[in-house]
């Protein structure tokens, strides 16, 4: 994630040798970061956030182990042919067949690739449970945070692509995706079966300009919320301001201008999700096919970023900053009795940097990373007004486990002062922020199979109000991710 994504076209048209080199590097790379990201996002973001979408978002692939990198061209070639069939235009990389459980058994993928069709599917299953003895268990209907009761969630995806470059469209592609999700606790859901994406993509001017339009999930197009393949930021801070997500895609047109092979500017004109949040959006539009929902307007997003991929002696770096403006009509938390009003907005700033390379020559992306994120939105229109995150993580921490990842993430979520003051005026116990420290270890068990375990301590895991029994939580986090 901290480098130029492999499924995005290189904005500079390199020589044939450079193109071949990139193709070989991709094919030998098992997409570790993507899987780790998908695992960690759900188990951590739901650890305290009251309504986090289960759609996981994904990060780009990490380097393969030494054995894979030492493999011959004969080993690499069988999977290189699928690179053009992976979804394009994302900041993250969904894995290729080399890191799936079925790869190309029975020749099904090969036969489809011959006619320009590619596919990837995955199942993501998460579990959270507060381990403190006074966990204040409740009925599921009255559950206030993820883990208060043992909480299970599953999200299942299928993405199919069709290659239009075979007809002369530069990097052309059609993408169709579906998603099914289920939660034992419905508030972060709800359950649904529906559209994940329906998109058209192509490039212009020798890949200087990228166009993607259709029903998009912009959580995978902007912000890079799964930093370095780890837990990632709490996406709810941006979802509340209208950004579309895996379970809530909306019509959008995205344009990305590559100033060079590292510096870019990306903009989107997107139909906002419901101003009442992801739960209201999915409840009103579970299929994801409706053009709009009640009170939803237009969201404009602009992101400026700098990406530099890890190489021998060159650290992995990703810097980005963005703003968003939403014309949807929101409830005013400062005066709930007045009419809804427009003018919501948000901003975000994030940076990730490789601090040390543990395998400079063999796998330069392995090593220790650090990063931070800051997100903000007006407190009168958003329950989350500020979000801060610090992270430290190690990719390929051991030579014997070159595809694993260890992460330590600290977060602070500041709640709207108007929502807090209103709760205090009613005599309720209320808190102005939520703090969490989360540690996870994610293991790559086999091609296409990942598992993660972690602990997350959360001070005030509920949203705005709490009881003496819900001030603290120590969530056990377990997740699996299987690609096919």
Where are these regions (language model features)?
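Outer-membrane beta-barrel "beta-signal"
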Residues: 470-484
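Surface-exposed loop and membrane-interface regions of Gram-negative outer-membrane beta-barrel proteins
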Residues: 128-154, 166-201, 292, 461-463
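Transmembrane beta-barrel strands of outer-membrane/channel proteins
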Residues: 119-127, 174-180, 211-217, 267-271, ...
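Residues on the lipid-exposed face of transmembrane beta-strands in outer-membrane beta-barrel proteins
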Residues: 121, 157-162, 198-202, 253-257, ...
């Amino acid at each position: 994630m901290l480098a130029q994504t492999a499924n995005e076209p290189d904005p500079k048209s390199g020589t044939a040798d450079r193109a071949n080199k990139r193709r070989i590097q991709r094919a030998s790379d098992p997409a570790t970061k993507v899987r780790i990201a998908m695992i960690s996002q759900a188990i951590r973001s739901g650890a305290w956030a009251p309504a986090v979408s289960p759609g996981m978002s994904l990060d780009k692939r990490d380097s393969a182990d030494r054995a894979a990198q030492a493999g011959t061209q004969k080993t690499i070639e069988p999977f290189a042919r699928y690179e053009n069939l992976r979804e394009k235009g994302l900041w993250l990389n969904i894995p290729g067949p080399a890191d799936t459980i079925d790869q190309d058994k029975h020749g099904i993928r090969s036969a489809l690739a011959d006619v320009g069709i590619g596919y990837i599917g995955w199942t993501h299953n998460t579990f959270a449970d507060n381990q403190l003895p006074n966990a204040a268990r409740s009925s599921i209907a009255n559950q206030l945070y993820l883990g208060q009761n043992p909480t299970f969630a599953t999200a299942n995806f299928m993405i199919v692509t069709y290659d239009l470059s075979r007809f002369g469209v530069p990097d052309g592609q059609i993408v169709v995706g579906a998603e099914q999700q289920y939660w034992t606790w419905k508030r972060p859901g709800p359950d649904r079966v529906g559209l994940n994406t329906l998109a058209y993509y192509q490039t212009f001017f020798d890949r200087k300009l990228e166009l993607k339009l259709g029903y998009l999930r912009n959580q995978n197009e902007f912000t890079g919320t799964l930093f370095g393949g780890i837990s990632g930021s709490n996406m709810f801070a941006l979802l509340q301001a209208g950004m579309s997500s895996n379970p809530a895609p909306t019509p959008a047109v995205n344009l990305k201008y590559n100033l060079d092979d590292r510096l870019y500017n990306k903009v989107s004109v997107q139909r906002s999700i419901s101003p009442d949040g992801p739960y209201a959006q999915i409840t009103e539009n579970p299929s994801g096919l409706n053009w709009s929902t009640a009170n939803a307007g237009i969201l404009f997003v602009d992101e400026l970023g700098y990406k530099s991929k890890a190489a021998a002696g060159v650290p992995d770096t990703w810097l980005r900053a963005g703003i968003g403006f939403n014309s949807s009509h929101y409830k005013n938390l400062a005066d709930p009795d007045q009419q809804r009003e427009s003018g919501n907005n948000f901003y975000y700033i994030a940076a990730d940097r490789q601090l040390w390379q543990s395998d400079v020559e063999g796998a330069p992306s392995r090593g220790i990373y650090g990063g931070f994120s800051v997100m903000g939105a007006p407190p009168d229109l958003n329950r989350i007004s500020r979000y801060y995150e610090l992270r430290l993580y190690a990719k390929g921490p051991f030579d014997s486990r070159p595809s694993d990842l260890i992460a330590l993430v600290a977060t602070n979520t500041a709640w709207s002062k108007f929502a807090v003051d209103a709760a205090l005026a009613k005599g309720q116990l209320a808190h102005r922020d939520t703090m969490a420290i989360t540690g996870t270890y994610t293991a790559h068990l086999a091609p296409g199979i990942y598992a993660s375990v972690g602990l997350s301590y959360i001070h005030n895991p509920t949203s705005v109000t709490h009881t003496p029994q819900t001030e603290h939580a120590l969530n056990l986090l377990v997740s699996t991710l299987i690609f096919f």
